[in-house]
Amino acid sequence: MLLLASASPARRRLLEQAQIPHQVMVSGVDEDQIHHPDPAQLVQLLAEAKASAVKLKVEQSAELNVSIKAVLGCDSVLAFEGEVFGKPVDAAEAVARWQRMRGKWAELHTGHCLIPPSFAPTTEGRAPEMQCTCVTTRVLFANLTDVEVEDYVASGEPLQCAGGFALEGRGGCCVEQLAGCYSNVIGLSLPLLRRWLSLS
């Protein structure tokens, strides 16, 4: 059983579609307290903080679920022209970002951290090890008109997503091309997770 340290519905849907048994426990980590100038490093730090916080909650729980194989923390940001874009704070910011990004490439970074709890079974006498990395996918945005930008932002979808778009939703119509892992843009890299789980 995988424990997802995230409140993201998109990440949960990915796990459900991949038929990976899981539960969800929100970390409660204050993301505003974690900083790093490199977006790839930033998302790794955030993912590790979330996974570590949930691991601690699980280990201190009176109702310990020994079926939990590992805790997975994830966090995503969009890097565009040297700036890091998380979720837009409001519609005006989302519109301004889209007007800058349209017709251009950006990088979607997702940090992943997999931590086996201390009670997880060891393999060949070795203690379970934490694994953390960042997966990056390049995204080419469609050259939307102002009307198309405003219409998409008015749907409310961009306000819920890192970078201001949801590839699995209406935002999929606003992306021309991807270079890299598709599921990574939605919230986590399923190929990476498959490799990690096969080794744990």
From Swiss-Prot:
If you read the UniProt record, what top EC class would you report for this enzyme, in one word? Answer: hydrolase
Q: Which residues form the active site?
A: D75
Q: Name one GO molecular function term.
A: nucleoside triphosphate diphosphatase activity
What SUPFAM superfamilies does the database record attribute to this sequence? ITPase-like (SSF52972)
Which Gene3D superfamilies does the record cross-reference, listed alphabetically?
A: 3.90.950.10
Needed cofactors, names only, are: a divalent metal cation
Membrane spanning residue stretches: none
What is a single cellular component term in the Gene Ontology annotation?
cytoplasm
Give the CDD domains listed for this entry. Answer: Maf
Q: Where in the cell is it found?
A: Cytoplasm
Question: Catalyzes what?
Answer: a ribonucleoside 5'-triphosphate + H2O = a ribonucleoside 5'-phosphate + diphosphate + H(+); a 2'-deoxyribonucleoside 5'-triphosphate + H2O = a 2'-deoxyribonucleoside 5'-phosphate + diphosphate + H(+)
Its family remark reads: Belongs to the Maf family.
Q: List the protein's name.
A: Nucleoside triphosphate pyrophosphatase
Native source organism of the sequence? Synechococcus sp. (strain CC9311)
